[in-house]
Amino acid sequence: MFVSRLAASGLLLLALMALSLDGKPVQQWSQGRPPGPPIPRLVVQQWSQGLPPGPPIPRLVVQQWSQGLPPGPPIPPLVVQQWSQGLPPRPKIPPLVVQQWSQGLPPRPKIPPLVVQKWDPPPVSPPLLLQPHESPAGGTTALREELSLGPEAASGPAAAGADGGRSGSKAPAALHRLSKSKGASATSASASRPMRDLRTDGKQARQNWARMVNPDHHAVGGCCCGGGGGGARRLKGLVKKGVAKGCFGLKLDRIGTMSGLGC
């Protein structure tokens, strides 16, 4: 209620102020400075008509502009025909020149086959040759000769002494032949010794491998039985008794025991 009363009183005051000031601002502006002098009619007419027009163009000049510039001299018919036909054609290329361009440049000379054949093939390395001490065949042959000549070499001097009177002429020849064969067999045996040492199927290689695998058993066997043979026999006995077992509890065969291929 109080707010509405304040609003009504404010509106009433505004209405009273408007009634009291009604017509006073308009009269104040109308009573201000006097207006400037009015524009005379002549000036108004001058601005409306614009600048005075220039002198009129005489009729002769008007006709001259309408007709344009005087035409030039007419082109003679010969010149007209020349432009219609265009420029005279150029001289034709002779047939010989046309054929030369169509054929193009002469082909380059081909490389003779002799130059192609001059390329040498790549060098081929010679095959590797085995030395006498690396030849497995020589070592086997030397081993066979040594084994075959062993008893004869042992019994050769004794037999020669016993049968000296009987075969006097044949004994020196036999001794000479025996010495030659012994020398050859010794040379071949010394040459094939590395190959025999590298072979894994020999008795000595098996004994060495057995010593490497089970040094304790071989040490005991060597003391009791004397040598590597006792150790090898000791190992075989242990295998037979079932001491040596595989990875999965199975018995090891001879190859697995000696070479370590059981697992």
Swiss-Prot record:
Q: Give the sites modified to Pyrrolidone carboxylic acid.
A: 31, 49, 67, 85, 103, 117, 131
Q: Name one Pfam family in it.
A: ANP
Q: Where is this site: Angiotensin-converting enzyme active site binding?
A: 86, 104
Secretion signal: which residues? Answer: 1-23
- Output the superkingdom of the source species: Eukaryota
Ranges where the record places region Disordered: 152-171, 177-205
On whether Lipid metabolism is a keyword of this UniProt record, the answer is no
Protein name from the UniProt record: Bradykinin-potentiating and C-type natriuretic peptides
